[in-house]
Amino acid sequence: MKFLFISPRYSGGIGGHASMLANQLSQNGHYVKKLQVPHIPIKNFKNPSFTVLSTFKSIIDRDSYDIAHAFNIPSAYAMKYANAKKKVLSLHGVFGEQIEKLHSKSVSSIAKSVESQALQWPDKLTTDSIATQKIYKEKFKLDFEVLPSAINTQDFSKIGNVKKIPNQVCYIGRDSYEKGIDILKKAESKINGNVVYCTNRTWIDAMSIIKSSSIVAVPSRMESLPTTVKEAFFLNTPVVATNVGGIPELIINNKTGILVPPNDPEKLANAINDLLVDRVKSEKLRLNANIFVKNNMTWDVMLPKFIKFYEDLLSD
């Protein structure tokens, strides 16, 4: 199959998923072209500039494709004008709600209007979590296919031997409101350990810190199906996370991790402290989580599902 992938970036979150999926498809004999354009690196202009430039590039692209796959709403315009037999739009989380939390009312209003239009353009909509699927069904009466993003287990071989640091708690992610980093900082003085914040590290550095830690804290206010949780599962580091979005699809409380309410520094600190001293529970969580991610969230499991999804779409 011949693909055009469209994403504002090919790293982190949904962009990282787009990059990994493109690589997996290429390694399995499919052709994938990643549409890439520069965009203005100024707040509130990054996505609009990407939308304009990517749309123009898509219009003048003389190639034809079996499938144009866009990742997130800003990519939808380029998808709309792509010369492809079928078109797919993937969203990880509810776009309008994310913009509402992070930007002004005027920006949010425009984003929601664009979202409602863009959702009508593709032949198929996908998301990575049942939670996001449910919200879009309730809000827009639209059916999303759930195709979780996977982790590339081969990449973890790049991480060398790492010594565990007792009572180290780590945070991996952006320094942003929706990730709840401020909640962890409020809880930090009550945590009986050292908290390490990784907001701008290379992937290998971040994974090494996860591997060396006793706990990974995920204090998010909004999430779909966070890759950090899957990575921690694979690296045998227990996770304490908020019960928002798709996180409960990964973490079964007291089985594959610990769930706490969002926006509650005290309960977050208490859960972390309890797990730091309970080695039996920590070992149980590590074992269960590692089995779960290897059985459900690797490319060996997920790539055949993506390929079947594309093949079924083309034959429809």
Residue map of PLM features:
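Active-site proximal beta-strand in glycosyltransferases
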Residues: I67-H69, A82-E100, T126
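Membrane-proximal helix-turn-helix segments that form the acceptor-binding/catalytic region
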Residues: S106-L125
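Carbohydrate-associated surface elements
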Residues: A131, A150
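Conserved donor-binding/catalytic core segment of Leloir-type glycosyltransferases
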Residues: V162-K179, K185-E188
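Aromatic "clamp/platform" in nucleotide-sugar-dependent glycosyltransferases that forms part
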Residues: R221
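Short hydrophobic beta-strand element within catalytic cores of glycosyltransferases
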Residues: P238-A241
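Conserved acidic donor-binding segment of nucleotide-sugar-dependent glycosyltransferases
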Residues: N253-N254, I258-P265, D274-V280
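A short, well-ordered alpha-helix in the C-terminal region of glycosyltransferases
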Residues: D274, K281-N296, K305-K308
